[in-house]
Amino acid sequence: MYKHPWLPNLDLIDEMLKEIGVNSLDELFNDIPAEIKINRLLNVAKGKPLSEYEIEKEINEKVKKNVELQAPPFIGAGICPHYIPNVVKFIIGRSEFYTSYTPYQPEISQGLLQALFEYQSLMAELLDMDVVNASMYDWGSALAEAVLMANRINGKKTVLVPENANPFHKEVVRTWIGGKGIKIEEVKYDKNSGELDLEDLEKKSNIDDISAIYIQQPNFFGIFESNIEHVIDVAKHKRALSIVGVNPLSLGLIKPPGSYEADIVVGDGQELGLPLNFGGPLMGVFAVRWDMSLVRQMPGRIVGITKDTNGKMGFTLILQTREQFIKREKATSNITTNEALLAIANAVYLSLLGKEGMRELAEEIYFRSHYAAKKLTEIDNVSMPFRSDFFEEFAIRFPIEYDKISNKLKERKLQGGLKLSDYTSLFCVTEVHDKKSIDLLVSTIQEMINGVETS
């Protein structure tokens, strides 16, 4: 009989096997072919259980291998470094919030429910949208859910997505719609401006099966889409839903999606008080305009205000018949354990920042990213491939292969941008990149290029 090397549960295993009428673990797993089973002890925990001291020592030895950068990373691609006020970490670390419990029971969850309602209210004001849910996993999953939602509403099968939208988000969408019969048609972008190609949009939208049209603002290259309202008009004309993906911080400078009547808005709250987390967990934003055909098809949880039997105001989850814990396979979405804790972090961050703080932060990011782009393009033969205005992220074209530049930056303990092509990279600059950090990046790249050209 199988015996676990150290967990003292052998009697319990025997009881469980007896209860289900099985004589051994081997019999329980006899459907698994013998040739793929491992019939030896695994070298887990160095072959023995480790003490707390030994575990801590092992982890610390691995941590020492980390490289401490001379400046904040200049890589973004949708997940960017920002300063997080200590109050954000403090509040979400409180035991009332720091839980995986879903507030199904409003009578014991008023604090958590009210905090989530505040998040929804703040995000709705920021986006100028009517209804915001309590969170999604991330931008990619929110976009995928928006595509599925559009298909449920109008039954159409084609979704237009820009080539200059985040490729990682598009990959998530393609994964989620597998087996649904939904087709993703990519719309080209203008190679000079970096913005959506309106002629190609008109061409691709000239069919009757358009379910939704998606546009990202700013787009993957950090460029503001100056014709976004025209895209919304095209969607209306085709009786398709418009989906806008937006960087929340950019709304300190530009018009919110609700002002130009977007149907669905998605995004990520990572830039509103969340760390990089090696790419996750993140915090998906999902909002719709006031239309019950949209609201009833929304994924995720929604917190609302009601009154109890004594007439007192209270908070509770609403429209729960949309959700999988009630309707199972007929639910609008299978998203269940969402990012409630991170939504509260967003609420704290937005409350702390306020309207003026949001505008000032957006301006700071705008000017710092433009300063970095200007200094980089002052290097001989370094240029920007796109001429349109940008925010936070921007593409730079180099005269030598970017891999060589990236390797040199790593030698100097600097993290460069994301490689877009052999000679082009996407850089990210936020409020944490001061003049010293930017100048260090520029001087290191200039030294590298000059050294190659003179050798």
Swiss-Prot record:
SUPFAM superfamilies according to UniProt: PLP-dependent transferases
GO biological process: glycine decarboxylation via glycine cleavage system; nucleoside metabolic process
GO molecular function: glycine dehydrogenase (decarboxylating) activity
Keyword vocabulary terms for this entry: Oxidoreductase
UniProt EC number: 1.4.4.2
Paired cysteines (S-S): none
Source domain of life: Archaea
A Pfam entry, by short name: GDC-P
Enzyme class at the top of the EC tree: oxidoreductase
Record's catalysed reaction(s): N(6)-[(R)-lipoyl]-L-lysyl-[glycine-cleavage complex H protein] + glycine + H(+) = N(6)-[(R)-S(8)-aminomethyldihydrolipoyl]-L-lysyl-[glycine-cleavage complex H protein] + CO2
Functional note: The glycine cleavage system catalyzes the degradation of glycine. The P protein binds the alpha-amino group of glycine through its pyridoxal phosphate cofactor; CO(2) is released and the remaining methylamine moiety is then transferred to the lipoamide cofactor of the H protein.
Family: Belongs to the GcvP family. N-terminal subunit subfamily.
Subunit structure: The glycine cleavage system is composed of four proteins: P, T, L and H. In this organism, the P 'protein' is a heterodimer of two subunits.
Name this protein carries in UniProt: Probable glycine dehydrogenase (decarboxylating) subunit 1
